[in-house]
Amino acid sequence: MLARQFVRILAPVSDPHELLQAGRFEELANEEHPLWRGLALLELGRFADAAAVFEEAEGAQESGTMLELAGAARWLAGERQVAAERWIAALDAGHDGPAGAVKAPALLLYAGLRIPDERYLLRGKRLLGKLWKPKLARVWPGPVAGFLLGEVEEQPFLEDGYEDPDLEARRLSGAHFWAGVKEQDPEKARAHFQESAAIEGASALEVEHHLAKGELRGGQLR
């Protein structure tokens, strides 16, 4: 069982969190906080609008989370190079501890695979290599680095989770996305993306949940 820690995007706020859990995205899109509003717009398929919300939020350029989400929104809007630029910017932005710093280089590696662009792929892999230490596997999303580098096996990567249902929804959605990215067999990859996209509720807080839906819409499989 993973240590009861998690790199939190935002401590749950009762009303928006309840709207998110209930899938009431039209209402959530009217929330004042840009994180909740942007997530709702992502769920509603209004990707360009979501990107603008994340990018224009106060302090967005210093927030790894906002830049990662902005990149996902740009990616889903078909602006892949702009998305990669947002993820590159996220490399130097603020993160919650060493585990939180894993996501931006992982997303850059993903961009390198899908665009494809070997520069992004190699840079993402190199940065993950610098970050990876076995103890990082105790706090999500730390295990993502080890998994993408071949240091963590798929079964424990998918199965070693949290008791808290919200944390586990977020972790499992992310884990299935990265398993799909790494999987060589297109049908198995698609199954992982389906698992990631199907998890509801708190999973919407995770970039990977939205990118998995994009994979299914676009059939962007190797």
Residue ranges and their predicted role:
Residues 32, 61, 94, 131-135, ...:
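Alpha-helical junction/boundary sensor with strong preference for TPR arrays
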Residues 36, 62, 100-102, 107, ...:
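Structural signature of alpha-solenoid helical repeat junctions
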Residues 22, 44, 77, 115-118, ...:
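Structural motif corresponding to the intra-repeat A-B loop/turn of tetratricopeptide repeats
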Residues 26-30, 49-57, 82-91, 118-132, ...:
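Alpha-helical repeat scaffolds
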Residues 17, 39, 72, 109-113, ...:
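Residue-level recognition of tetratricopeptide repeat
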Residues 35-43, 129-168:
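Alpha-helical adaptor scaffolds
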Residues 10-27, 33-41, 175-182:
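Alpha-helical segment of the N-proximal tetratricopeptide repeat
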